[in-house]
Amino acid sequence: MSVSLSRLERQLGYTFKDQELMVLALTHRSFAGRNNERLEFLGDAILNFVAGEALFERFPQAREGQLSRLRARLVKGETLALLARGFDLGEYLRLGSGELKSGGFRRESILADALEALIGAIYLDAGMEAARERVLAWLTTEFDSLTLVDTNKDPKTRLQEFLQSRACELPRYEVVDIHGEPHCRTFFVECEINLLNEKSRGQGVSRRIAEQVAAAAALIALGVENGHE
């Protein structure tokens, strides 16, 4: 094992028994051979479970939608990339020449994906308890800063954070119709996101309100919120 990977293990707070798992977790798809996408898939599932379980225990009075929004804040790409930068993870990534030249080692999505892959690798290396312990340790500051007040955000913000947590494209809003006189208009808006086959719709006395209604409809269609909160 190289000195550099030993340093990364110290930063992560975990020593791998199988060093090949660690190397694979750091290997981007642009690099020749096997890559970290399968480990990322596994790590994403573990991260969401561990975060959800911890939130369930920490906020016993929270409703389902509130827990979902808190979890989205914890596992979003921005949060994971920030953690990854704290570990200097970009220095250890195995990237293809094109990604290296374009600065892929600094890219938020690549850093977040690699951290999820490391979670998956730790799980395969030592089991669920080891993975849970590391996730909770890494997210201690984020967990301690959460309150239920954080769930009192408007639907557009909640939808954006949910999509960002899954590395999805942001929603696209379009005014498709306007009814009424200038002093008493009704705006009709459609919200399009890649995760849904159909556009979500909203209407209101202003474009802003119509967009919020459309975003709320999208959250319900995604199953993030049930519409009864």
From Swiss-Prot:
EC number in record: 3.1.26.3
Active site: 44, 116
Subcellular location per the Swiss-Prot or TrEMBL entry: Cytoplasm
Residues the entry annotates as binding Mg(2+): 40, 113, 116
Domain RNase III: start-end pairs: 5-127
Family, similarity comment: Belongs to the ribonuclease III family.
Subunit field text: Homodimer.
Function noted in UniProt: Digests double-stranded RNA. Involved in the processing of primary rRNA transcript to yield the immediate precursors to the large and small rRNAs (23S and 16S). Processes some mRNAs, and tRNAs when they are encoded in the rRNA operon. Processes pre-crRNA and tracrRNA of type II CRISPR loci if present in the organism.
Reaction(s) the record says it catalyses: Endonucleolytic cleavage to 5'-phosphomonoester
Lineage: Bacteria, Pseudomonadati, Pseudomonadota, Gammaproteobacteria, Pseudomonadales
Main location, first listed in the record: cytoplasm
Entry cofactors: Mg(2+)
GO-annotated molecular function: double-stranded RNA binding; metal ion binding; ribonuclease III activity; rRNA binding
Protein name stated in the entry: Ribonuclease 3
Biological-process GO terms, alphabetical: mRNA processing; regulation of gene expression; rRNA processing; tRNA processing
PANTHER family from the UniProt entry: RIBONUCLEASE 3 (PTHR11207:SF0), RIBONUCLEASE III (PTHR11207)
Gene that produces this protein: rnc
Enzyme class, UniProt record, top EC level: hydrolase
